[in-house]
Amino acid sequence: MSRWLRWLLSFLPRTAPPGPRLAIVRHHRVYAEGQQPLYRLGVGVATLERQLDLLGALGFTPVTVAEGLAWLRGARDGMRVAFSFDDGYRDNVALAGPALERRGARATF
């Protein structure tokens, strides 16, 4: 990820309204590196890994959507990010699954 984009995203926690935050990141497809995307609603594995790493470095804890909604109704400490992979494509689990697992992150499929 470019230094400029990392710098820009570093303002996210500071510019959001005070209080707990639940960010939701949604992807339709996950592409292997070098694979030509069929449409722009997908993400490459390396990009997904950078998203996970950057949001983790910014202090977001990865949760499922259900966990994030329960957290909003409960204690609400810190910041949470819910990754959602919709449409049930095999690449969601086959490619995103290992990237999430390596980081101990959870997501909604």
Region roles according to the model:
Residues 1-109:
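Catalytic alpha-helical scaffold of carbohydrate-active enzymes acting on polysaccharides/glycoconjugates
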